């Protein structure tokens, strides 16, 4: 699988990340999310339990459309590969300092690679030129999942000056601002976690509203 087929079917990819329950996954699925993310980094507040991850995987793969994304950060290729098989992940998201080709060459699944603006803009331009499209860049904060909004103005100015660059945007997204986000230059996807939570727990109403608003464009 590459991202080409996904993007052929969707104008924008809508991702809900940090899912920890089957109920939240089902809500995101029914709302129309294209990507559902689970945190596979140990000892984080949103780290998925193995048994729940397997249940969510079964649910998602019955849908036939939504893809399951496993999020990792500076973990070994071996560990990522093992969990990729155990959870039947469709896509691997690397949120640390990894060299994404090293992981892709072993795991053979599409990669979402977290990049920092403006430090990693060269990575973005390189990735966007590859065919087939097996890696998508994702602009987010260093830690991710913090609710920190990025500098949309600077990113938009940079993207407008480039030739055919695209990226997933994360960081500080909510149902209230996602319609603006999907209209920014270069944005082909949006990614939310904390922005659809209430008191640190996924909020079904917020998930539904977020996905609906993201899909309105």
Curated annotation (Swiss-Prot):
Pfam families: PRAI. Keywords: Amino-acid biosynthesis, Aromatic amino acid biosynthesis, Isomerase, Tryptophan biosynthesis. One of its GO terms (biological process) is L-tryptophan biosynthetic process. Pathway: Amino-acid biosynthesis; L-tryptophan biosynthesis; L-tryptophan from chorismate: step 3/5. Belongs to the TrpF family. PANTHER family: N-(5'-PHOSPHORIBOSYL)ANTHRANILATE ISOMERASE (PTHR42894:SF1). This is N-(5'-phosphoribosyl)anthranilate isomerase. It comes from Candida glabrata (strain ATCC 2001 / BCRC 20586 / JCM 3761 / NBRC 0622 / NRRL Y-65 / CBS 138).
């Amino acid at each position: 699988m590459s991202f080409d087929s996904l993007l052929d079917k969707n104008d924008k990819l809508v991702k809900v990340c940090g899912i920890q329950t089957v109920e939240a996954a089902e809500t995101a699925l029914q709302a129309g999310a294209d990507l559902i993310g689970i945190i596979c980094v140990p000892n984080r507040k949103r780290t998925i339990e193995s048994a729940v991850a397997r249940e969510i995987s079964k649910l998602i793969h019955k849908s036939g459309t939504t893809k399951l994304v496993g999020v990792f950060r500076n973990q070994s290729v071996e560990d990522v590969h093992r969990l990729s098989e155990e959870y039947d992940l469709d896509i691997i998201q690397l949120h640390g300092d990894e060299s994404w080709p090293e992981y892709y060459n072993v795991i053979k699944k599409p990669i979402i690679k977290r990049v920092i603006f403006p430090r990693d803009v060269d990575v973005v331009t390189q990735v966007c030129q590859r065919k087939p499209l097996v890696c998508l860049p994702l602009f987010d904060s260093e830690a991710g999942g913090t609710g920190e909004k990025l500098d949309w103005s600077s990113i938009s100015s940079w993207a407008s000056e480039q030739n055919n660059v695209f990226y997933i945007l994360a960081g500080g997204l909510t149902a209230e601002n996602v319609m603006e986000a999907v209209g920014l230059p270069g944005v082909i996807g949006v990614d939310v976690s904390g922005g659809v939570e209430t008191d640190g727990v996924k909020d079904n109403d917020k998930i539904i509203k977020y996905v609906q608003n993201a899909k309105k464009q």
